[in-house]
Amino acid sequence: MNILIVDNNDSFSYNLKHYVEQFSVEVKVIRGNKLDLNCIDEFDKIILSPGPGLPSEHPILLQTLDKVIGNKSILGICLGHECIYTYFGGNIKICSEIMHGKTSNMKHNGDKLFNKIPNPFCAMRYHSLVGDTDNVPDVIEIISETSNNIIMGIKHKKYDIYGLQFHPESIGTNFGKQLLKNFLLTTEISS
């Protein structure tokens, strides 16, 4: 299996690569500003990494989604998650509490992405933006939230597309490796 990590200038991108490589897959990291959309076909799954800024400041991520929806499995983390949420019509807003290097308990709905992960579990957060719950797109299902109902995980109802606001690649996230493994297996695990 060939995995593409689109690196959005984030220091965690190589932590992500290191974790994913542990599952006997080929992983290539390409900076978003260097990504040639014509090369995407050679990859089985795509991970949109964390990074600074707003989704609108990363048009390559939105172009990537345009090209691969329905053909590739996608996992967006932090910025990648926010891009997926806005791509399908959701709005993002500034967090009431900025979460940089803070952990929170995450509850989940038992989706296959959370296979073998306790409910709740502790995860590391580095973000100042969140998905607005006032306009969740019809095609999006919320699969994880904090105890005060801040969106932490989403999936597309039809396609193999997931987003996580928290950081599974952080050592501060319990079961982060299991989450990434579950993403690699998403087409093989039944819900």
Question: Could you describe each region identified by the protein language model?
Answer:
Residues 1-4:
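Extreme N-terminal starter segment of soluble prokaryotic enzymes
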Residues 7-8:
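Acidic di-acidic motifs
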Residues 17-25:
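Two-component/phosphorelay signaling modules centered on CheY-like receiver
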Residues 26-34:
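A short beta-strand-loop structural module common to alpha/beta enzyme folds
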Residues 34-43:
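Short amphipathic alpha-helix with an adjacent loop that forms part of the alpha/beta core around
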Residues 43-116, 122, 180-182:
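Cysteine-nucleophile active-site neighborhood
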Residues 112-158:
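Catalytic beta-strand/loop cores that center a nucleophilic Ser/Cys/Thr
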Residues 168-191:
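Acyltransferase
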